[in-house]
Every structure is written in structure tokens, then in C-alpha cells.
Amino acid sequence: AGLRSFPPSIEYINWLGDDDLLTTGSLDHALSVLSGNPGIALVYGGCEYIDGEGKSLWLNKSGSYAKYLMRCGPQLIPQPGSLMRRNAFEKIGGLDHQYKWAFDLDLFIRLSRVGKLQFTPRTLAKFRWHDGSLSVGGRNGSVAEASVIRTAALPIMLRAIAPLWETPIRKVILRTGEKLSLRSARAQN
């Protein structure tokens, strides 16, 4: 039944990986952004990447341009650092279960079609970067799946030439992931 079984009084949705964290006051802050702005479908903020022990590796404060970049570049909107309106989530049909890794990118692209994606400069969550996580351990699959999602979201006339930018983007995303994994390994030693 999942989210559809929630009582009607639940107006907002955030989902958090079992090893990720919200920062103190993040939900209150995100709610304050959403509450006065009915046109906003999702609010997102910064996300601190931490290793398995909780040591800081990197701070993603991608800014408001992330909502535009996600259609043609890396997905920089942090899923644990976002809060969405339930009615917007339901309007787009919820998660597309054909995706295993990049379902959040697909979700964010579809949410952007029914409402505004709003950045807040506050750090809202912490994402634990370790090989055991689905996102990190399945990095190659995740990057490939995100490429499929971005290409499908393009106008039909651009899809045939998408490999011109998708190939270098995939390489950069994979290299960035390798660097974070190295930083995480060093922090544990």
C-alpha cells in the first residue's frame, strides 16, 4: 500500500535512506518554505556527504541551478534533503518502479512539470557515502539509468544527439563518485 495508505492528513513527503540523516530543524524549515507557497511542489536544500563513521566528505549546496541542470547534466538535487507536497506526488502518479537507482531523478523531473522546485540555502540532510549503499555500490547502473531518464525527458528532436553530452557527463559523474569513495576510504584510515 505504501504512501497511498497514509491518512489524508499527511500533506508532505520525505523519504530517507536507513543510513541517512536529517539535520536539526530541517523539516520545520522546509515546511516553512512550502507552507506559504502553494505553487512549490518540492523544496530542496544542501546535503552533506558523510562517511560510514559520520565524518564530513563534501557539502553539496548545488543551488537553484540544479533544477535546470538535472535535465542535461548531473542530478544534484539531494533526495534525502528534499520535501515534496503529497498532492504533487500523487498528481504525477508517484514513483516509477521501473527504475532501480535513479528513480529520484525521474521523480524530480516529473514534479517540475506540475510545480516549482525551490532551493533553500540551508543544509537539510546528510547522505552516508559507503560501498554498501545502493547509490554508491550500484554507481555504474545508477549513472546509466540517469542517462536514460535524462534522454527520455528531452524533446524528441534532441534525443538522437544526446550521446554528444551524455557520454562526457557520465564520465564526470563516475569520476566524482570515485573521488568521494577515495575520500571516504582515507577518512576511515
Residue spans of the language-model regions?
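Membrane-proximal basic amphipathic "stem/tether" segments
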Residues: 147, 151-189
